[in-house]
Amino acid sequence: MTILTYPFKNLPTASKWALRFSIRPLSCSSQLRAAPAVQTKTKKTLAKPNIRNVVVVDGVRTPFLLSGTSYKDLMPHDLARAALTGLLHRTSVPKEVVDYIIFGTVIQEVKTSNVAREAALGAGFSDKTPAHTVTMACISANQAMTTGVGLIASGQCDVIVAGGVELMSDVPIRHSRKMRKLMLDLNKAKSMGQRLSLISKFRFNFLAPELPAVSEFSTSETMGHSADRLAAAFAVSRLEQDEYALRSHSLAKKAQDEGLLSDVVPFKVPGKDTVTKDNGIRPSSLEQMAKLKPAFIKPYGTVTAANSSFLTDGASAMLIMAEEKALAMGYKPKAYLRDFMYVSQDPKDQLLLGPTYATPKVLEKAGLTMNDIDAFEFHEAFSGQILANFKAMDSDWFAENYMGRKTKVGLPPLEKFNNWGGSLSLGHPFGATGCRLVMAAANRLRKEGGQYGLVAACAAGGQGHAMIVEAYPK
């Protein structure tokens, strides 16, 4: 019997799994605050012989907004174009020096399936600049970035723009399969008799719309259900999840008020006011959060709207270059993009444990340990997902039985973890979050005086990603 197929109704919070995944209590608010930054000593650089250094010059994003708000009348390429335009203004990079543009997205608008190309043309890039779009669920922007890293490291390109976009306010809603088939057959009919025969087969239930799938294709389970079962399997309580969500919103509000979210660029929405900041940051109270009912597994689940990331519209873009090219153009890069790793697990049993599996692999590849990391930036799909990953990473038993490791991965110190908020509070436009994570790590390293950042994320399909970001010397 696997972790997540253990019967939910027989798995109380104080289950035998809690004994396996012993961890310091997370239900103490004082432990969920970000501690003041500590200046770190310079460590070794991760430069590798005969491999080009790839640097982040800068990165921007549109404000991340709750779906159905100010961006609801736009198309995805409008948001992507805004991110590209913001990047051009921020960096003053000549459009003609950009060799390639790569964007990530998840739910594609059929009119602009290659949204990277349409956005690039709309932003004024040359029609001679190639662009393509990738999709890898919540790590689509990560894939866009690492594809760019590969093109630069191999010498194919010097200058790449990588980013991502998602517009959840207007997802494609299709006719039913029966209606689509009928319309296609009618289009092929060559006589009135054939058309009348086909029309006679029409039934009113053909008009029922087909909404975008919210469940995993391979398992038929929604991510929220999986998060609820994961939290139960790792004995993560409702209170712990609510406290972590409150931490995320509180830290995001503090960072927003102090002007630390410098990657956000204003966006003048056509026909509306200029949007200048994320609108999903809403610090509440544990008392208010406790009033919410379970969102997925009812009535006993612990995942709610308050401790889950919300549907978000937004776009991001980053300028990445070969180090020698950036310096030749007079830029002062923000960070190096170093080793990265992609992983995959069983989507039924371990859908959201990508960070647990990817973290030790990327650390070993880079020759680092958890103690070397100064800034952790993990994607927060759900509070329960983050806390379950914490418990898995801090468990020798899990490492031995599920990861084939002799010892546990280790627990990220909360005082270094998502100090400016995360996806729970800032929002999660599926295709754009990866760039936000990397820029948060890069900006935190510069602000806090650290050297290494670790970015990690889970994704639909049971996949995950982790990357090492190294601060560029001041």
UniProtKB/Swiss-Prot annotation:
Q: Which cysteines are joined by disulfide bonds?
A: none
User: Gene3D superfamilies, from UniProt?
Assistant: 3.40.47.10
Question: In chain numbering, where does the site feature Increases nucleophilicity of active site Cys fall?
Answer: 428
One Gene Ontology term from the biological process aspect of the record:
fatty acid beta-oxidation
Report the EC number(s), separated by commas if there are several.
Answer: 2.3.1.155, 2.3.1.16
Share what the entry says about its subunit structure, partners included. Answer: Heterotetramer of 2 alpha/HADHA and 2 beta/HADHB subunits; forms the mitochondrial trifunctional enzyme. Also purified as higher order heterooligomers including a 4 alpha/HADHA and 4 beta/HADHB heterooligomer which physiological significance remains unclear. The mitochondrial trifunctional enzyme interacts with MTLN. Interacts with RSAD2/viperin.
Enumerate the NCBIfam families for this protein.
AcCoA-C-Actrans
**Name recorded for this polypeptide:** Trifunctional enzyme subunit beta, mitochondrial
Species of provenance = Homo sapiens
Q: Which gene encodes it?
A: HADHB
